[in-house]
Amino acid sequence: MKRFLVVTFLAVAMPLLAFGQAANKKSSSKAEEEIMKLEDQWVQSRATKDTTMAKDLLSDDYLGANVTGQAQTKQQYIDGITAGTIFAGKAEMTDRKVRIYGDTAVSTGFVTGVAGADKVRYIRVYVKRNNKWRQVASQGTRVEGGQ
């Protein structure tokens, strides 16, 4: 009887576990797509010095480190966009990866076309708050020789 109960339990539980993993994977890929889309919009808005996206996307407690190692708050970042010191013109992102950890996302890749640097490796951290992704931290490192 015990054996029958164990086999029955496993027969019922295994498909449920597999379904749960598939649903979680779908949720992660949807979140990855959301972050990729936000990052595309982010680059476009910075290229045109449009601060609307930064005001909406950056968390109020945002802290970033730019390619020169300076720490920047949300307001300092927005001021830099307006002044044209953070970003100027068209940029291209490559080797992009997004990893989802529940309500946190980590985005990495390269961006070319950043003012004062040929190529920058970046990492950005997002947290989902009130059903909306917010960038809470970022860091850019200049890659010598554009490699």
Residue ranges and their predicted role:
Residues 4-7, 21-147:
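A beta-strand edge to alpha-helix "cap/lid" segment located at domain peripheries
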Residues 7-16:
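Bacterial N-terminal signal peptides
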